[in-house]
């Protein structure tokens, strides 16, 4: 029987690796032929995905909050969805701002024995909000 916490664990690691800028650590949770698509971008391999993550260096910080999850295992393959709110802190015209995104990740995870990795993780952006920050 497959541990039902696996999708949550992978999603939390993904958020941590992004927020801590540990982009190469994605290799721990993604297959080499990992793919991702979203509005205005795509990656056809894990190397391309990691290269795409460099755009996040334009932000002074990010904060990805992992929320609801729903999905099912069928043999060694999981297909499901992860809800997330991603905050991106940046400066514009001398003002600190926060771009928030409501995201629904479309997750596909495979298992080989005791190793679980993403095959794909597509993004559906439900909403965005860009406001000045208050500290």
What are these regions (language model features)?
Residues 79, 102-135:
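Short beta-strand edge/turn micro-motifs at domain boundaries
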Residues 23-86:
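A solvent-exposed, acidic/Ser-Thr-rich amphipathic alpha-helical stretch
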Residues 13-14, 84-85, 102:
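A structural preference for long, well-packed, hydrophobic secondary-structure segments
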Residues 1-24, 28-32, 47:
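Short, low-complexity N-terminal intrinsically disordered segments enriched in polar/charged residues
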Residues 58, 96-98, 110:
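Short aromatic-glycine motifs in intrinsically disordered, low-complexity regions
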Residues 87-97, 128-129:
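Short, cysteine-centered beta-strand-loop-beta hairpins and adjacent loop/turn segments enriched
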């Amino acid at each position: 029987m497959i541990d039902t916490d696996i999708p949550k664990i992978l999603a939390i690691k993904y958020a941590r690796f992004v927020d801590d800028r540990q982009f190469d650590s994605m290799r721990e949770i993604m297959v080499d032929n990992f793919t991702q698509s979203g509005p205005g971008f795509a990656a056809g391999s894990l190397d391309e995905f990691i290269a795409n993550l460099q755009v996040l260096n334009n932000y002074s910080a990010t904060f990805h909050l992992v929320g609801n999850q729903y999905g099912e295992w069928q043999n060694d393959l999981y297909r499901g969805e992860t809800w997330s709110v991603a905050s991106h802190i940046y400066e514009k015209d001398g003002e600190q701002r926060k771009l928030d995104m409501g995201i629904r990740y479309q997750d596909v995870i495979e298992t080989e024995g005791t190793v679980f990795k993403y095959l794909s993780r597509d993004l559906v952006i439900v909403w965005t909000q860009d406001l000045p920050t208050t500290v």
